[in-house]
């Protein structure tokens, strides 16, 4: 298996630092079969240094804190420099800053991972594609005998889309307030949105 070969960028800069796109893409990654892999720093939305040669731009030190060398090392100098320019400056974007912020990328990462872990269908269920009438809308269902099926629904476009119409009431696992969509009413899909739905 190969990881991070060929792409010289981190995820957040590729997504123009857009949290909606980040959430939709990570929800998609975590709902597909297989073992999820996060590249270090992506759990806090770290940026990259495109001026470094080869793939070194996305291998900069992990940004643990606003301390010297981003809290990564007490050495006088690290092999690769820390990112010190906005919007990915280590002094403002680091684990310590995000640790207690319920709206941070780190909190969203933890929420996605915990929600996935709590659903047997997302961990090891079979995948069945669901047809939609819109090329920008991706839908599939994950099923297992060990728990309820999860309908995964994504709008991968920059404009709202009409969603599918559920046959039963469904709860959105990705809506922190536990939003319920009633049977027979279309689920509206905001731009770059993700939904994990259970009956």
Locations of the language-model features?
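A conserved amphipathic helix/loop scaffold
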Residues: 154, 181
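Short, flexible beta-strand-to-coil junctions
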Residues: 144-145, 177, 199
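A structural detector for beta-sheet-dominated domains
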Residues: 65, 130, 165-168, 190
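Beta-strand-rich binding/interaction modules
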Residues: 160-177
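Loop/helix patches that line or flank the sugar-binding groove of alpha-linked glycan CAZymes
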Residues: 1-150, 156-161
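C-terminal beta-strand-rich structural cap/linker in extracellular carbohydrate-active enzymes
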Residues: 183-199
């Amino acid at each position: 298996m190969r990881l991070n070969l060929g792409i010289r960028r981190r995820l957040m800069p590729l997504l123009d630092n857009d949290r909606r796109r980040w959430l939709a893409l990570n929800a998609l990654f975590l709902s597909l079969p297989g073992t999820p892999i996060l590249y270090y720093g992506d759990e806090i939305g770290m940026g990259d240094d495109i001026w470094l040669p080869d793939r070194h731009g996305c291998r900069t030190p992990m940004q643990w804190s606003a301390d010297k060398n981003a809290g990564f090392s007490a050495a006088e100098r690290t092999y690769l420099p820390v990112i010190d320019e906005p919007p990915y400056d280590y002094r403002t974007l680091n684990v310590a800053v995000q640790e207690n912020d319920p709206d941070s990328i780190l909190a969203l990462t933890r929420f996605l991972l915990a929600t996935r872990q709590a659903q047997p269908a997302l961990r090891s269920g079979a995948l069945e594609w669901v047809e939609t009438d819109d090329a920008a809308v991706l839908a599939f269902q994950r099923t297992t005998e060990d728990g309820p099926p999860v309908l995964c629904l994504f709008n991968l476009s920059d404009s709202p889309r009409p969603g599918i119409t559920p046959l039963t009431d469904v709860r959105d696992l990705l809506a922190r307030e536990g939003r319920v969509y009633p049977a027979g009413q279309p689920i509206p899909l905001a731009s770059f949105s993700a939904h994990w739905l259970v009956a």
